[in-house]
Design a protein with these regions (language model features):
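Nucleotide/phosphate-binding catalytic cleft detector across ATP-hydrolyzing
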Residues: 1-171, 177-178
Length: 178
């Protein structure tokens, strides 16, 4: 799938949805159709006995410190990167399944995803994010550094040969980029 190709729209392109994900240490945001559709704490609740994830986001956050000892809450991201691979993958999957516009679809759409990643991320961590996205139906997965995404988000012309400083203050990391 080359985005620059001159071929007509593929027959199944109508079954592809575009989403952008900002996986943060404190919060996860998902954008679909130019709207923030998920803005939720990056936290999961796991049943200690079965190992099953029973809640994510706001619901899991409300359980923190208030449930019996068989339910443990986990923040699957540390310093902006995946610390608990399985928990973060389940969290992403459950967040995507809760996107209102995608719930109404007859078929599960293929997803074209743009995911924000911190600048200091390693190749292994990048691969973990990409593989996680592919397992939750990401057919095309693009990774973009958070300061670059912030620059584009505020409308800076990133192709212009002029310097700008971006300060991205997150829940787990702060990045400064020029």
């Amino acid at each position: 799938n080359n985005l620059n190709s001159k071929t007509p729209m593929g027959f199944f392109d109508f079954m592809t949805e575009d989403i952008a994900i900002d996986l943060g240490t404190a919060n996860t945001l998902i954008i679909h159709n130019d709207k923030v559709v998920i803005d939720s704490p990056s936290i999961v609740a796991r049943d200690r006995i079965s190992g099953k994830i029973i809640a994510v986001g706001k619901e899991a956050n409300m359980m923190q410190g208030k449930t019996h000892e068989n339910i443990k809450t986990i923040r699957p991201l540390k310093d902006g990167v995946i610390a608990d691979f399985d928990a973060s993958e389940q969290m992403i999957k459950m967040f995507i399944k809760s996107i209102p516009a995608l719930k109404k679809k007859l078929f599960t759409p293929a997803l074209r995803m743009v995911i924000c990643i911190p600048s200091g991320i390693t190749e292994v961590e990048m691969r973990a994010v990409k593989e996680s996205a592919e397992r939750v139906n990401g057919k095309e997965v693009y990774l973009i550094h958070e300061p670059m995404a912030a620059a584009i988000g505020i409308g800076l012309d990133i192709m212009q040969p002029k310097g700008n400083m971006i300060v991205d203050i997150g829940g787990g990391t702060t990045e400064i980029a020029v």
